[in-house]
């Protein structure tokens, strides 16, 4: 039985019965954990307003089985104020984490990166793309995705900024004359290593890489948050 307070965020919530919710949390000490929030759908439930995304929470739960029961949830601080594009970006991060994190496996460093990511999305909405790419690379590292961006996987030679490299899943980057969707310039790979996305071309290459790298983790089912983001983006650009 667990009775201590734990820091966490809501990743996803879904109906469990007429009155309750199943809630996926990302917690500092236990990683992703699904808890039964009894009565959380009732109009007067104190949990109803608390169990919202982007709100730093203090949580307590109990139970011995796989599905434990949430016994207490309190805001640790104010909900992070997300503007439109930042809001959908936050939903994207939450949806990806809900899919890729192992159940009840601690990712303490990634939890800190998540907190930094959410804070930056709320305070630097003009930097959404670099913020997302940075977190995706940090997430891949936490998942054990061991790609070396500074060494050619075939020869062991240092990556040359002027050469082109082909990405091979489960191997790494190999020097190649081929030019296709899996090709990357050495200068971009070296920037990936430093999480430096200040160059626009590097930023675009980083997005291309993370989509390929995350695909095995995410599976074939489309991300709902990505579809929502793509649907609101044209209207946002027109009004902006």
Swiss-Prot record:
Keyword annotations: DNA damage, DNA recombination, DNA repair
Signal peptide range: none
Keyword Disulfide bond: no
Biological processes, Gene Ontology terms: DNA recombination; double-strand break repair
Keyword Lipoprotein: no
Annotated GO CC locations: bacterial nucleoid
Pfam families, sorted: RecO_C, RecO_N
Protein function: Involved in DNA repair and RecF pathway recombination.
Stated family: Belongs to the RecO family.
UniProt name for this protein: DNA repair protein RecO
Source species of the chain: Actinobacillus pleuropneumoniae serotype 7 (strain AP76)
